[in-house]
Amino acid sequence: MGRKPLVGISLKIYQNKIAEAVNYAQSISQLTNGENDLELFILPSMGVIYPVAQALHNRENVIGLGAQNIAPIANGALTGEFSIESLVDLQGHYVEIGHYERRTYFHEDDELINQKIQLTLKNQLVPLLCIGEAQQTTGAELKTVFKKILAADLANISPAQLATLIIAYEPYWAIGKAAAAQASYVAVAHTMIREALAELIGPTADNVRIIYGGSVSKDTAGSLVNNPNVDGVFVGRFGHDPQNFAEIVKIVKQVKLQAN
């Protein structure tokens, strides 16, 4: 199948109580039980990441655990931050880095994002790097935008280290909107990301999975992933219903298996 397709979800801070977070994690685990053709992950609200980790570990499941953020250092005086040491201890696997909301509201710059990526790789976890553009533009301009972001965020990291990197393409203008970006636009954007990445890290770019995030729903998932450069989807609020998340997984699987 080549690059293994991905479906993941970030709960941001929508599910912050232990009971609801655990129930959701158990529900999607049960609904996707036995799924081996896709890689699945959940990024729970940070305050409930421990009980969610316990819930996932206490049952047969294929849902990987990740964190929505980490501190740029593993240990030290950073009040209120979340250490990657905790995620490792929880047997987490993914680290979301560079989301639009972190870049915008918390003023995280490329240097800080680069530090977090390097720390994630040092701990043998998977960085999920989020990138996007502020407004719709042409393919050539998109490539220029993406190459600038990637060059800064991936600075001083060898291509060999980046084989496990996941890129989540989330156009800023589509986050939280009623509808996702058009599938044709997403296809061009993903192609430009891979081309920009290839110019920076060479053949390793072929191993990097690029998924789309931004108002993904069960109605749009199929058309969005119907392109060889779109390796999956990063779901938000339209996956808060476990049945909807499971349906998105089913749709992505059908499309990607048919394509191979």
Give the predicted meaning of each segment:
Residues 1-168, 172-260:
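Active-site loop-to-helix "anion-binding N-cap" substructures in soluble metabolic enzymes
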